[in-house]
Regions:
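Predominant activation on well-ordered alpha-helical scaffold segments within soluble catalytic domains
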Residues: 82-89, 143-147, 189, 193, ...
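Active-site catalytic microenvironments for nucleophilic, acid-base chemistry
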Residues: 87-91, 176-179, 260-267
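N-terminal Rossmann-like NAD(P) cofactor-binding subdomain of oxidoreductases
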Residues: 1-129, 134, 234-236, 271-273
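Residue-level signal for short, function-critical loop segments
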Residues: 76, 179, 248
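C-terminal substrate-binding/catalytic lobe of Rossmann-fold NAD(P)-dependent oxidoreductases
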Residues: 1-6, 98-99, 103, 108-242
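NAD(P)-dependent Rossmann-like dehydrogenase/reductase catalytic/cofactor-binding core
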Residues: 228-274
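Loop/helix-junction capping segments adjacent to catalytic residues or to phosphate/diphosphate-binding pockets
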Residues: 78-82, 182, 251-252
Length: 274
């Protein structure tokens, strides 16, 4: 009932929309200027009238979120990509014209109710369900968000994989040193470390550290049930590999919404988050 919803919106300070894209767009239309809103759907993430809700994106993003009436919560996949790529473009380590390639792993909870229902009916020992690559038309719905908010002039190639575990995520970007305008892997680390050294939820792992690895393997579940994102730089003189690891349900979704809610209300950003 739209009239009932409208009455509820009028009484609220902030509404968080957790709806499919079309329903979120319709709800936002009903809300109008009745209250402030955070939209967790894809509907408004590249809309010019909405503020993008990734506080760590730039030095001024928090201030923009704090004063915004309409905030679009970022997508799970784009967050890691953006926090790895944007500083490198801003600092001139990467050109905005660089052709970027990104692979990602996610727990199946990222696919929503339909995927969760489908995959939980399939035994995890089914070899065909261990991992599933998708987005092979190279037009995943997050690609525009990844390009626009990174400052890139070109759409990245983005290939995600849904895995048999419920939650957890890694974003991976491979680069050649020849693409870095004379810079090396350590320069990439230094750039990311400088950008995020004072952030509560972004942790840049020391360059060359094996601490995140277990028997030389990286577990994509390593940040689960926290709002923390770990950024890692691996490489040699010729090649660099960037990784972001986080929980797709927390930092990748609900945790970011709580972060934005805290900022918009003028509260301590860390309240309700670990």
């Amino acid at each position: 009932d739209l009239s009932a919803r409208s009455a509820i919106y009028t009484k609220a300070d902030i509404v968080i929309l957790c709806l499919p894209d079309q329903a979120a767009a319709e709800a936002a239309e009903v809300i109008g200027d009745k209250c402030r809103v955070i939209d967790a759907s894809t509907a408004h993430r590249t809309h010019k009238d909405w503020t993008y809700g990734l506080p760590e994106l730039t030095s001024t993003q928090r201030q923009r979120i704090a004063g915004a009436d309409k905030v679009s919560n970022p997508g799970c996949y784009p967050q890691g990509y953006l926090l790895l790529v944007r500083p490198l473009i801003e600092e001139g380590i990467l050109s905005a014209e660089t052709l970027l390639r990104c692979n990602a792993l996610s727990g199946y909870s990222g696919g929503g109710k339909a995927m969760i229902s489908k995959l939980e009916k399939t035994p995890c020992n089914d070899e065909g369900m261990i991992s599933r690559i998708y987005g092979l038309n190279l037009d995943h719905k997050h690609v525009s968000e990844m390009q626009i908010h990174s400052g890139s002039q070109v759409r990245p190639i983005f290939i995600p994989t849904v895995c048999s575990f419920y939650r957890g995520m890694t974003i991976q970007i491979s680069l050649f040193s020849s693409e870095l305008n004379g810079h090396q892997a350590k320069d990439v680390y230094d750039c990311l470390h400088k950008r995020y050294e004072n952030e509560s939820f972004i942790k840049v792992i020391p360059f060359g550290s094996s601490k995140p690895l277990t028997d030389d393997f990286l577990n994509p579940l390593g940040c689960n049930e926290t709002n923390e994102m770990e950024l890692m730089v691996f490489g040699n003189r010729e090649q660099i590999h960037l990784i972001a690891r986080y929980d797709n349900l927390v930092k990748g979704a609900a945790g970011s919404a709580i972060q934005n809610l805290n900022i918009m209300l003028g509260c301590d950003e860390n309240i309700g988050l670990i």
